Amino acid sequence: MNSPDLWYSPETQFCFAAANNSCPRKARPALVVCAMYLVMIGAIVMTMLGNMVVIISIAHFKQLHSPTNFLILSMATTDFLLSCVVMPFSMVRSIESCWYFGDLFCKVHSCCDIMLCTTSIFHLCFISVDRHYAVCDPLHYVTQITVGVVGVFLLISWSVPILFAFGLVFSELNLIGAEDFVAAIDCTGLCVLIFNKLWGVLASFIAFFLPGAIMVGIYIHIFTVARKHARKIGPGPRTKRALSESKMKATSGKESKATKTLSIVMGVFVLCWLPFFVLTITDPFIGFTTPEDLYNVFLWLGYFNSTFNPIIYGMFYPWFRKALRMIVTGTIFRSDSSTSSLHPAHP
């Protein structure tokens, strides 16, 4: 990431006018500033509200209490926390090019940023494992993917990113070898997350490329198996066996639709975050010369992934739309609302 311009003109505005070593503020036209605030505030509000609907729906409606939905609930919680803890402060930093919240909170913010991003992709990775058993081994799915197993998934999805993020940032291992650059750009009001060559590669591999590759491999296998199942189930007489196959076909269709939806969620995640992680790897090798605005564009493209997930649920999950209607109309406050049917039961 580019260092702040150290050659100041007389018209330069500073983050802290009274400070001797203040960072310069980036001058932007008022119209551009207003547009940026509108877009980013809109994204933050949509992320908060959309993921809140997912959280309330799965937590409240008993019909949605399933292992897969518990994973989705936890992922929505991750996205909701991102919109509350990370995005508002990143918005001010991106637009004003200043950090007004102190050095300690800069570290905490950076930790939360890394942690929640990594937690999201870990959730998606475990959701792909869940879908693999649901489609490829449906007869044993209920006994293999239990609430206890999902609990282990959630423990790993949260604990590993927390240890990774806070351990890396507070140990400053990511700064070893980049001390001269850090000293050159140091000023009051600066909060940037810098990775040296080693940790730029390692962090991106751990948080994105490794679990992303696992997910892609799992979903390719799922789609291959789903196509084979579809070809095997064909028309036949209405015997007990045919009825059983019909039931299997209905179940397979339901699982296939759910898998396609979750694949879209994963695909959107990869498309949103891939540019940022490529930049994280390449920036140390090109002398940290990535333009600040390009860095912010890629960063916010990644944040928008947390905005898109509830929209995808709304497009593909009827239960989400019905739950949203019940929340908006206040029907959810009825005493028997938790037992409401949000989607038809399969025979």
Curated annotation (Swiss-Prot):
A Pfam family it matches: 7tm_1
Record bears the keyword Signal: no
GO molecular function: 2-phenylethylamine receptor activity; G protein-coupled amine receptor activity; trace-amine receptor activity
Coiled coil: none
Any one GO biological process: chemosensory behavior
Principal location listed in the UniProt entry: membrane
Region entry Extracellular Loop 2 (ECL2), spans: 175-188
CDD domains, alphabetized: 7tmA_TAAR2_3_4
Glycosylation sites: N20
Domain of life: Eukaryota
PROSITE patterns assigned to the protein according to its UniProt record, in alphabetical order: G_PROTEIN_RECEP_F1_1 (PS00237), G_PROTEIN_RECEP_F1_2 (PS50262)
Segments on the Cytoplasmic side according to the record's topology features: 59-69, 130-149, 219-260, 318-347
Database matches in SMART domains: 7TM_GPCR_Srsx (SM01381)
GO cellular component annotations of the record: plasma membrane
Subcellular location: Cell membrane
Designated name of the protein: Trace amine-associated receptor 4
Species of provenance: Rattus norvegicus
Record gene name: Taar4
